[in-house]
Amino acid sequence: MMMMSNLPNDLVEEILSRVTVTFMRTVRSICKKWNALTKDRSFTNKYIRNIAALGEREFLMIKEFSIYLVGVNLHGIQNNNFDLSIELKGKLISMDNTIRRFCISQIFHCNGLFLCVSQKDMDNRLVVWNPYCSKPRWIKPSYNYRTVDRFALGYDKSCGSHKILRLFGDNLNNLEIYDLSSNSWRVPNVTLERDIVYMQPGVSLKEKTYWYARDKESEN
């Protein structure tokens, strides 16, 4: 019987590209060769193509301050007939114990990175987490974080850097941006609309963040 270690590299890549993301950390821990292979860009692209070919979309769900991966198969949506297959794939965990103790209330996604926000008021911590590599990055605030603050995670193509947007203050009229490349906050020279009320935390969809908001005049 041929052992896995004796198989051709292209065959090993094909096999590993069909492993679900919840078991990828286990795969990487088996041997250095597999760890290096699964972090290669060509493997990542193939992995994404395989998932797309299944007609399945994956969503993140927060339950009891932890993150779970949920798979939704969309093949059943044809001719206005809805037959969705929903599967709880597993809990996303980190080897870093500080992440495990972090009470997550909001999460935003961009290019494989997660921005996690604590549910505790005045908890001066944000974390940017790459679950694929299990590497958390703690972000220090310029001012104390509050549960009413609004956040977003994005990518600036002009400089090749991920950035965090934060709205804060009594009326969320203050804006600052954190650059992950320079590890620093800055206040952009922009004026925010003062007549907008942000009703709920943002929702991350297809690398963009959306907020449910309305005019102050419509509150009555």
UniProtKB/Swiss-Prot annotation:
It comes from Arabidopsis thaliana. Pfam families: F-box. InterPro entries: F-box-assoc_interact_dom, F-box-like_dom_sf, F-box_dom, SCF_F-box_component. This is Putative F-box protein At3g20705. Disulfide bonds: none annotated. Residues 1-51 form the F-box domain. It comes from the Eukaryota.
